[in-house]
């Protein structure tokens, strides 16, 4: 049975209005996106730029075009040499929560969920090493006890999720935790032991979480081990070199990072992989960690690809 002419006209009109609305939203998203990234280049107006990029309201519009930009950018990135080891200083969870009117614990949870997304993107691009800075030794002494306890609970949940995650086992991802584990509560240690044991035989990808981590402490531990071995005669003085020190670090069984990314606009290293990142390329973005998008990751990789690595020369 044919529909009445009036209903056909109405359907066509609604379809046209829907198309115009989608075009308008797409234009608005692209404009906001371009404006945000342009503003971030100018230090004097970082405040409004950061709000645009990190606002959960603005981001809901921007994200509609972000996927399109990510696909185009990914095509370019995948056609060039990729970093083999990406390290990330995941910063900005608490500021994201504050700007969004949320409790700090919810900001940390949003950061956990973002890490799961980023792992997907890294696996998709076949980048074999991903290392993230989750908790420093300074955080343990400087954070309030209730926030630390909430973080510890989140780490237990995250590690347990990883141990059961189909992506981990399907992609042969070895999960490791580096840091002063003796500073962590028993429930976190149990979760670490379980997850590391379940993934210890995997070797296609390595995902390292730095917990209770401090690079100076790591180097001190390595030096102490070398000194002890030299004292008992098992290590000759002439054998002490960069390779000997590197292999004694908590991260000694993996290559140095090629690219170190830090979110939230802070431009400092914060005692993270000091020895290992001597020749790494650094990329800083004003985006808070929970707002970090696939496009942000791809832009970091593209910036890395556009640099000429000199390795100290």
Map each language-model feature to its residues:
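Flexible, compositionally biased loop and terminal segments
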Residues: 2-11, 15, 19-313
């Amino acid at each position: 049975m044919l529909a009445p002419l009036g209903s056909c006209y109405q359907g066509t009109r609604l379809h046209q209005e829907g198309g115009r609305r989608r075009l308008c939203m797409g234009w608005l998203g692209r404009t906001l996106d371009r404006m945000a990234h342009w503003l971030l280049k100018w230090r004097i107006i970082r405040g409004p730029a950061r709000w645009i990029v990190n606002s959960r309201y603005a981001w809901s519009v921007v994200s509609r075009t972000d996927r399109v930009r990510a696909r185009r950018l990914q095509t370019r990135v995948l056609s060039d040499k990729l970093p083999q080891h990406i390290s990330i200083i995941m910063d900005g969870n608490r500021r994201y929560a504050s700007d969004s009117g949320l409790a700090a614990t919810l900001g940390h949870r949003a950061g956990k969920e973002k890490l799961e997304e980023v792992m997907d993107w890294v696996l998709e691009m076949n980048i074999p090493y991903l290392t993230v800075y989750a908790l420093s030794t300074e955080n343990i002494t400087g954070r309030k006890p209730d926030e630390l306890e909430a973080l510890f609970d989140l780490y237990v949940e995250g590690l347990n999720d990883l141990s059961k995650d189909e992506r981990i086992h399907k992609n042969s991802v070895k999960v490791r935790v580096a840091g002063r584990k003796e500073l962590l509560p028993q429930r976190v240690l149990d979760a670490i032991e379980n997850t590391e044991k379940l993934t210890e035989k995997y070797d296609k990808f390595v995902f390292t979480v730095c917990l209770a981590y401090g690079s100076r402490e790591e180097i001190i531990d390595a030096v102490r081990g070398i000194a002890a071995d030299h004292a008992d005669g098992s290590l000759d003085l002439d054998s002490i070199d960069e390779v000997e020190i590197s292999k004694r670090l908590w991260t000694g069984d993996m290559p140095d990072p090629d690219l170190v990314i830090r979110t939230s606009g802070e431009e400092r290293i914060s005692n993270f992989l000091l020895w290992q990142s001597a020749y790494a390329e650094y990329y800083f973005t004003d985006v808070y960690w929970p707002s970090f998008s696939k496009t942000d990751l791809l832009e970091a990789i593209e910036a890395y690809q556009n640099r000429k690595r000199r390795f100290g020369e």
